[in-house]
Amino acid sequence: MMSKLGVLLTICLLLFPLTAVPLDGDQPADQPAERKQNEQHPLFDQKRGCCRWPCPSRCGMARCCSS
């Protein structure tokens, strides 16, 4: 019984490794990718470093421009 459980656990870990789990959004490894996505967004103003109005949630971590 225990050997069957061990084999099943091994197969599951091979099929679904723990590194395949996505990182949380606040992890430093994720932030450069989000900044790059912000800069590619059509409403992102690169000179001011913020999103123009209307500031969509898809603009990511960038702040909304005040005016």
Swiss-Prot record:
Negative results: has no effects (10 uM tested) on the human tetrodotoxin-sensitive Nav1.1/SCN1A, Nav1.2/SCN2A, Nav1.3/SCN3A, Nav1.4/SCN4A, Nav1.6/SCN8A and Nav1.7/SCN9A, as well as human tetrodotoxin-resistant Nav1.5/SCN7A. The cysteine framework is III (CC-C-C-CC). One of its GO terms (molecular function) is ion channel inhibitor activity. One of its GO terms (cellular component) is extracellular region. Belongs to the conotoxin M superfamily. Keywords: Cleavage on pair of basic residues, Disulfide bond, Ion channel impairing toxin, Neurotoxin, Secreted, Signal, Toxin, Voltage-gated sodium channel impairing toxin. Mu-conotoxins block voltage-gated sodium channels (Nav). This toxin specifically inhibits mammalian Nav1.8/SCN10A sodium currents (IC(50)=2.11 uM) without inducing a shift in the current-voltage relationship of this channel. In vivo, shows potent analgesic activity in a mice hotplate analgesic assay. In addition, this toxin has better analgesic effects than Ziconotide, an analgesic drug. This is Mu-conotoxin TsIIIA. Residues 21-48 form a propeptide. It is found in: Secreted. It comes from Conus tessulatus.
